[in-house]
Amino acid sequence: MRSTLLSIFSVALLLASCGEGSQQVTLEINLEHNGVPFEVGETLYKGDTAIKFELIHFYLSQIALGDQVVEPVVFINAQDSTSMHYVLPLTKKVDQFSFGMGVDSINNIQDPTSFGSDHPLSSANAMYWSWATMYRFFKIDGRVNATGALGTNDQLLAWHTGKNALYRTKEVNVSIKPGAHLVLTFDLAEFYSGVSLDTETMTHSMVDDYAIAVKLSDNLPAAFSLRVQ
């Protein structure tokens, strides 16, 4: 809920939030592939295989500074810069940043139609599985081509993870003071590490493809890294 976690709409607000006497920190979420920043729609490579991620949506939950949860859930749309920048309240130094990857079990049973369109859990974000009556955690779509050139005979990629058993958490022990700028990076190459781009490009967390969803979910803690500036 964005009453305590507000989107950054301008560089001016970012700079103002980081001055002396600040009672907040800024959070920036970035994408990387093998440590190199990229944008949705850009062609990437794993060996000779070309990859293009055309949609990257996911949830982060129970975002906490120290022992204080500052936001129950946020929705990230990698093509919407406002969903990649936030301001979090912080009045004193803490030594830990923690968060969940996906939707926690309490929020995962919520009815998406009960929320306004600007709420992270709203049906407007198209992240709810009506057949499973729960949310997708990560929704990543795209294309791959083993020839190294996209455009002809591409193989579709759809990694949709969800279900409570696939929720993962991470704690980062690091000193954070009011006025700091936090950079949380999601490395997609780490996310699909050990996953075949030939035979494991599709999962909807159902019985026949659940093992792929487990692999991807187990990779999540290593795929996210935090830097404090």
For the regions a language model picked out, list residue spans one by one.
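A short, solvent-exposed, low-complexity linear motif enriched for acidic/polar residues
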Residues: 19-229
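Positively charged n-region of N-terminal signal peptides that target proteins for export
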Residues: 1-5
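Sec-dependent N-terminal signal peptides
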Residues: 6-11
